[in-house]
Amino acid sequence: MTSINEQLTQKFQDALVKSFGEEFKDVDPQVNLARDLRHGDYQANIALPLAKKLGKNPREIAQIIINNLSLNTICENPTIGGPGFINLKLKSSYLETQLKSLYQNQRLGIEKVHNADKVIVDFSSPNIAKEMHVGHLRSTIIGDCIARTLEFLGYEVLRLNHVGDWGTQFGMLITYLKEVYPDALTQADVLEIGDLVNFYKQAKKRFDEDPKFQEAAREAVVKLQSGDEESRKAWQLLCDQSRREFQKIYDRLDVKLIERGESFYNPYLNDVIKALDEQGILEKDQGAQCVFLEGFTNKSGDPLPLIVQKSDGGYNYATTDLAALKYRIQEDKAKRIIYVTDAGQSNHFAQVFQVAKKANFLPDTVDVTHVPFGLVKGEDGKKLKTRSGETVKLKDLLDEAVNYARKDLENRLQAEDRKESEDFINHVAETVGISAVKYADLSQNRISDYIFSYDKMLALQGNTAPYMLYAYARIQSISREGNIDYENLGENIQILLKEDTEIELGKYLLQLNETIKEVEKSLLPNRLCDYLYELSKKFNRFYENCPVLKSDEPVKTSRLLLCDLTARTLKLGLSLLGISVLERM
């Protein structure tokens, strides 16, 4: 189903050809939603840039375009505003027809893209032997939302988890565990993940303070890298232990990922160095192999190179990222690769992408994008920490959100003198708690830092998950009272728009298509959150001003259909955010 914007754009392009000739057929008519609804629903701004090109008055150009526009079935007569804006007001009859088509479409009018490319979304990426913390929250849920949106639009999406499963930390950990807990290197599940994290901290302390231990750890890394059977088995056990803990978090967040850690690319690292050398872009700097790039300098203004091989011959993150990028293009055949990491890595990825272009790993036909995000801060405005100053564990954060949601629900049940089963309370608390954490994050512009507040994210008013979930549950309650079988209405449906608030709701329901396409393009989930919040508010205004259950037919059924269409839109939008709806709260 073609969006309103696409329909209007096509009509304007036809009018431009009629008005000024075939050479104008691909000119963008600049059709957008009107900012001031007093002037109409949509606005075309093409007359202004065209007037400059043709050397005529913009209002004169606008009138010529209007004379050749064929919009009788879609809009009232177009008007010219200001210096030459073309204002368009949609007809109620057109809106009613569009809403009927939307209602009868299982995908709410959103078509899948044709000949969809393969897309890789690289997100989450925790480190082995460490617990997932609040820093992993944003990457995990932003990446999941982007992947869900692209999958819904028909793209083949490979969701990759680039876990940190290689490096000197394993030499430290294996060496330390051999001394204090050797069973952990030969038997599964003898350690809790928290114990493993503590052992890692102690190993790091020893590494920093004890030269002999440092040497032993380095030897352990060499043994691991050379494929020593005992070392590999110990490494595998440590990885498996962490994986199981990660999976518990992913299951709770309903996030699907395919693990392909740093170690996967080890066989390809030497080939990366060879390729860079063959291209003649490697330079030695203090014993390290580097690539110097334009536009990258340190604080002193000196050139800042990307180091791809350390002076001791070892590789680093840049080497692994280049190998991964090369593999994803050449082996996975990806045409679009999206990296979801914190904004602190923006410079790193800009360098990696530029080196990949210089080395001919990255052709112009492949789009690579770094999707940066800001910090999660506490209510004191500082980076979110525990009272003891440690990074907040993601598991603890989710548990606390669910506990808050449970208390809120129990207080509400008591106030309403309502009894519910323990299963109901557990399900609602878990759903609301996890949804609140997700929505609070996704509703912010990802580029910004945001303040983490349980009270704000669990509020039943405002741009929050509980508000959205309550709006959906309320509509389901209305539908149950309306006693209507939506599935068996067939072709005999009619949506009537009479009152201002139902016209506004109808118009807004038709903007979902454009919103999802905007998220596809901008990779900003907050655009979808803003749409859903505004939709909920418009529905509430409609319900307050337009009787539904007490109306006579055919208005009653029409308004129930608008209720159901709103519920379906909320459900779809929330599902793209990774949030499940509740039939009752």
UniProtKB/Swiss-Prot annotation:
HAMAP family: Arg_tRNA_synth
Identification of the protein by name: Arginine--tRNA ligase
Organism expressing this protein natively: Crocosphaera subtropica (strain ATCC 51142 / BH68)
Catalysed reactions, semicolon-separated: tRNA(Arg) + L-arginine + ATP = L-arginyl-tRNA(Arg) + AMP + diphosphate
Superkingdom of source: Bacteria
The family this protein is said to belong to: Belongs to the class-I aminoacyl-tRNA synthetase family.
EC code(s) of this entry: 6.1.1.19
Subcellular location, record wording: Cytoplasm
Motif range ('HIGH' region): 126-136
Keyword presence, Nucleotide-binding: yes
Subunit and partners: Monomer.
Disulphide bridges, residue numbers: none
Annotated InterPro entries: aa-tRNA-synth_I_CS, Arg-tRNA-ligase, Arg-tRNA-synth_N, Arg-tRNA-synth_N_sf, ArgRS_core, DALR_anticod-bd, Rossmann-like_a/b/a_fold, tRNAsynth_Ia_anticodon-bd
CDD domains (alphabetical): Anticodon_Ia_Arg, ArgRS_core
GO MF terms held by the record: arginine-tRNA ligase activity; ATP binding
Name of the top EC class for this enzyme: ligase
Entry's Gene Ontology cellular component terms: cytoplasm
Keywords, ordered alphabetically: Aminoacyl-tRNA synthetase, ATP-binding, Cytoplasm, Ligase, Nucleotide-binding, Protein biosynthesis
Example GO BP: arginyl-tRNA aminoacylation
